[in-house]
Structures are given as C-alpha cells and as structure tokens.
C-alpha cells in the first residue's frame, strides 16, 4: 500500500497522538478535523490540513478515530463527506469504538463501492499512544488488513491482533470496554473499602499494583485515585455507551452478563451524583475514574487528595 497517500480524520484525545505517530514515522498524512485548530499542531510537523472530508476522497487509505458510529457514517457518507468527493479510498481503517450492527452496515455500503473496511479499535489512552504502549485488535478482509498492517502497527506500539473477518474486532473492543467498566467500578469499591477501614489509598493501591491482580491499567489509574486527578482520558458518557453496546451484544447472542448490568447501573448513579456538583455537565466531561467519588458518597466516606505523586508506568 502506498503510504504516501493516507488520510486521517479525528483529532481528539486519541486521534491527535495517533496521527502524530504516523507523521513522525514519515507517512505523508492529509488530515481533517471539525475544529481546525486541533489539527494545526500536526501541520507544524509535516501533515497537510484539508478543508473538508470530501478533499480526502482520493487517498488510498482513509483512517478515522471519532466518538460514535453516527460520526463515522456522517464522515463517510454525509454532506461533504469523504464519499461526496470525486474518488473512493481503497481501504477505510476505522479505529473508533462503535456498535457491531452499525459497523456491518457501513461495511456493506462501502462494499457496494468496491472499498474495504478494516476495523482496528485500540486499547489505551493518549499517554499510551505517546509511550508506544497502545495495542489494537483488527478485523476485516485479510488482504486489506495485510496492506494496512504497517500503518496500524505504527500507531499500536504493543502490537495488533488480527482476529478474523467482518466485525469480530468490534466484539473484542466492546468486551474490552465492558471489562474496563467492571474493573474500574470494583477498584473504586475496594479502594473506598480499604480507606474506610483506615488504609491510605496510596498504600492500598501500591499493594494491589505489586500483587498478581495489578496491571498496566491499575498502575496508571492509581495517580488519579490517590490525588483525585480527573484529567480526562475517557468520559463516563463514552463508558456508558460501551456498556450499553456490551449488554446489547449479550442479548443478541444470549449471553447472560449480570456483572455488566450491575456495572451499568452503578455507573448511572454517577450521572445522578453529578447533579450535586456546581457544574454537572463539566464534571461529566472529566475522567471516568471519578466514579471513586460516587462510591465514596454512597459509603458516607470523605475523599481528600493525598498529594503523593505515583508513577504511571508510562513515563
């Protein structure tokens, strides 16, 4: 695949550092973002900004990293979308987390235009991208995947797992984010439990991180839990969307998911607790790790920052 003719759409918390890795790897990237100012830093290091998605219709590979399936559909098929231009990219690579049915519909519409879709959702956040510790899971036509594997691997420093045809990668990412929600909720619960028993959060989480239950994720989130730092990596709203996708998949495939259902209800309580804040909407734009505050509220436990920096493992 000609890596000198690649387009990229989406410059959010994930999209910008992902696209940056491609530019720094020497790929001649043409980019578009709804808010142009978010794309301008990449222009300074060699990317080219276009005026609309339609201007990317002539690229060989079109990559997207956006929030929802509706965003993907609008970018591909909408007014001034990529396919409103004069050409059709050969391969579409979508890194977004969207529903299985919506992805299948997008794939079918692209197939009518002789274009392939490779789904490549990722695991990690913006700091993981920059540290080269992002991973990806991919599905779609094997021939198309082989042509864009180098592009995906450039972004996913920990590697990409090809799992088969169609929307299988979507199922994997939905399952991944279901686990993300359940682990975060449980970690918040046991952290509040330990604190209420008298254990400082840093001491408890340090023990957990060094135990067989520790992980890249628990270590990374420790600083947030210890110092009440809700700098956004992933919002509660997006997590709720993914839990809903997981429950929908469970119903479709007749898989009981009681832990996921309980996590979804616990997360909903966080939206209610947000109404107690001075700026509920702004609060919900913060990080999903703030679930810790909702658990503490329900337990009648007061949280204060311990003001003790903790290494994230991504330094």
Which residues are covered by each model-predicted region?
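ATP-dependent carboxylate/acyl-activation modules
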Residues: 310-315
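Hydrophobic beta-strand scaffold residues
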Residues: 29, 49, 117-118, 201, ...
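Rossmann-fold dinucleotide-binding core
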Residues: 75, 97-178
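NAD(P)+-binding Rossmann beta1-loop-alpha1 motif at the extreme N-terminus of oxidoreductases
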Residues: 1-65, 90, 95-96, 126-129, ...
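Rossmann-fold NAD(P) dinucleotide-binding segment
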Residues: 53-116
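Helical "substrate-binding/catalytic lid" subdomain
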Residues: 167-294
């Amino acid at each position: 695949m000609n890596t000198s003719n690649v387009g990229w759409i989406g410059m959010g918390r994930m999209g910008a550092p992902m696209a940056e890795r491609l530019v720094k790897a020497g790929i001649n990237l043409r980019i578009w973002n709804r808010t142009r100012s978010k794309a301008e830093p990449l222009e300074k290091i060699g990317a080219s900004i276009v005026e609309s998605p339609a201007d990317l219709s002539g690229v060989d590979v079109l990559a997207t990293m956006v929030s929802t399936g509706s965003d993907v559909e609008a970018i591909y098929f909408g007014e001034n979308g990529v396919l409103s231009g004069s050409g059709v990219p050969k391969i579409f690579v979508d890194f977004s987390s969207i529903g299985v049915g919506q992805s299948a519909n997008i794939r079918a519409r692209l197939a009518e235009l002789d274009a392939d879709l490779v789904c490549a959702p990722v695991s990690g956040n913006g700091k993981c991208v920059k540290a080269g510790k992002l991973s990806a899971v991919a599905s779609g036509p094997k021939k198309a995947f082989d042509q864009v594997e180098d592009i995906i691997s450039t972004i996913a420093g920990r590697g990409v797992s090809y799992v088969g045809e169609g929307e299988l990668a979507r199922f994997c990412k939905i399952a991944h984010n279901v686990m993300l929600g359940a682990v975060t909720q449980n970690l918040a619960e046991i952290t509040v439990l330990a604190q209420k028993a008298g254990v400082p959060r840093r001491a408890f989480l340090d023990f957990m991180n060094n135990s067989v239950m520790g992980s890249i994720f628990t270590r990374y989130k420790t600083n947030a839990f210890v110092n009440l730092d809700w700098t956004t990596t992933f919002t509660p709203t997006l997590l709720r969307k993914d839990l809903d996708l997981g429950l929908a998949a469970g119903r479709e495939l007749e898989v009981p998911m009681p832990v996921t259902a309980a996590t979804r209800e616990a997360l909903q309580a966080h939206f209610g607790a947000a109404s107690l804040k001075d700026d509920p909407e702004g609060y919900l734009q913060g990080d999903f790790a703030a679930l810790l505050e909702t658990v503490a509220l329900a337990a009648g436990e007061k949280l204060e920052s311990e003001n003790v920096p903790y290494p994230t493992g991504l330094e």
